[in-house]
């Protein structure tokens, strides 16, 4: 499954690699990889495979889940697809409270006293996941864990989740993606060294 998802992400250019002409993330980090999983929404077969893959992760690791929660904004559609298939309540978590109305940070199903799984599109450092988890816990939820489409495999993410003692699982990761990209002839062996060094240095 990991390789199939990685191939799909590369094929539809949800993930692009540029070892010699780095991208600049919103955080200012210079990176040879850019991931925009919102692109998957335009490909029904890909988004369906992602939905089913995430559902399998949830059934395997968090079978007692009662509420599906998406992170705003890119996690929301995938959470909706999953909640619909599993016939479960769903909500989503903003990065901060609204500045108007009821000033809610969580919209949708009530979380208090419920076992919740958080849906992310991408895990880089784990920061957005922690924000969502903390908001849900504050609302009285029992957060079981996080599932996501892809992770860069950064040590910082591992440390982030370890610090809050929460498990996370992803459909694919950086190592799988690089391997698939090489097999597909999208990158050279020299590119792989650059990509691995970038990840290790950033970690």
From Swiss-Prot:
UniProt pathway annotation: Pyrimidine metabolism; UMP biosynthesis via de novo pathway; UMP from orotate: step 1/2
EC numbers on record: 2.4.2.10
Keywords: Glycosyltransferase, Magnesium, Pyrimidine biosynthesis, Transferase
GO biological process, any: 'de novo' UMP biosynthetic process
Source organism, top-level taxon: Bacteria
Reaction(s) the record says it catalyses: orotidine 5'-phosphate + diphosphate = orotate + 5-phospho-alpha-D-ribose 1-diphosphate
Gene Ontology MF term list: magnesium ion binding; orotate phosphoribosyltransferase activity
Key word Ribonucleoprotein present: no
Cofactor dependency: Mg(2+)
Quaternary structure and partners: Homodimer.
Functional description taken from the UniProt entry: Catalyzes the transfer of a ribosyl phosphate group from 5-phosphoribose 1-diphosphate to orotate, leading to the formation of orotidine monophosphate (OMP).
Protein name: Orotate phosphoribosyltransferase
